[in-house]
Amino acid sequence: MSGRGKGGKGLGKGGAKRHRKILRDNIQGITKPAIRRLARRGGVKRISAMIYEETRGVLKSFLESVIRDAVTYTEHAKRKTVTSLDVVYALKRQGRTLYGFGG
């Protein structure tokens, strides 16, 4: 026994998480007020009703491309954990340099 408790390191150890809410479409987790707050930060005064779904779609495609690149860096380094540097390099590759997280 490794003393890890119920979770264990191997697959199939421990039961299901009891209080985990199942989100079928996670992009809906980006709520209308959250999009509104981001727009306010950008100086937007009024927002059309159709903007919310469009924003979710654009955000989803942007995050998919960044995460895909970050995972590629992680796999190349033969690691299983995506680090902040992987994300920084992925953003830099797409021409969106981010400062303050190393690299």
From Swiss-Prot:
Residues 1-14 have a biased composition (Gly residues). It is found in: Nucleus; Chromosome. One of its GO terms (cellular component) is nucleosome. The modification N6-acetyl-N6-methyllysine is found at K6, K13. Glutarylation at Lys-92 (H4K91glu) destabilizes nucleosomes by promoting dissociation of the H2A-H2B dimers from nucleosomes. Keywords: Acetylation, Chromosome, DNA-binding, Methylation, Nucleosome core, Nucleus. InterPro entries: CENP-T/H4_C, Histone-fold, Histone_H4, Histone_H4_CS. Residues 17-21 bind DNA. GO terms for biological process: nucleosome assembly. The keyword Acetylation applies. It comes from the Eukaryota. Its main location: nucleus. The modification N6-glutaryllysine is found at K92. One of its GO terms (molecular function) is DNA binding. Gene3D superfamilies: Histone, subunit A. SMART domains: H4. SUPFAM superfamilies: Histone-fold (SSF47113). Residues 1-20 are annotated as: Disordered. The modification N6-methyllysine is found at K6, K9, K13. Belongs to the histone H4 family. The nucleosome is a histone octamer containing two molecules each of H2A, H2B, H3 and H4 assembled in one H3-H4 heterotetramer and two H2A-H2B heterodimers. The octamer wraps approximately 147 bp of DNA. Core component of nucleosome. Nucleosomes wrap and compact DNA into chromatin, limiting DNA accessibility to the cellular machineries which require DNA as a template. Histones thereby play a central role in transcription regulation, DNA repair, DNA replication and chromosomal stability. DNA accessibility is regulated via a complex set of post-translational modifications of histones, also called histone code, and nucleosome remodeling. This is Histone H4.2. It comes from Emericella nidulans (strain FGSC A4 / ATCC 38163 / CBS 112.46 / NRRL 194 / M139) (Aspergillus nidulans). The lineage of its organism: Eukaryota, Fungi, Dikarya, Ascomycota, Pezizomycotina.
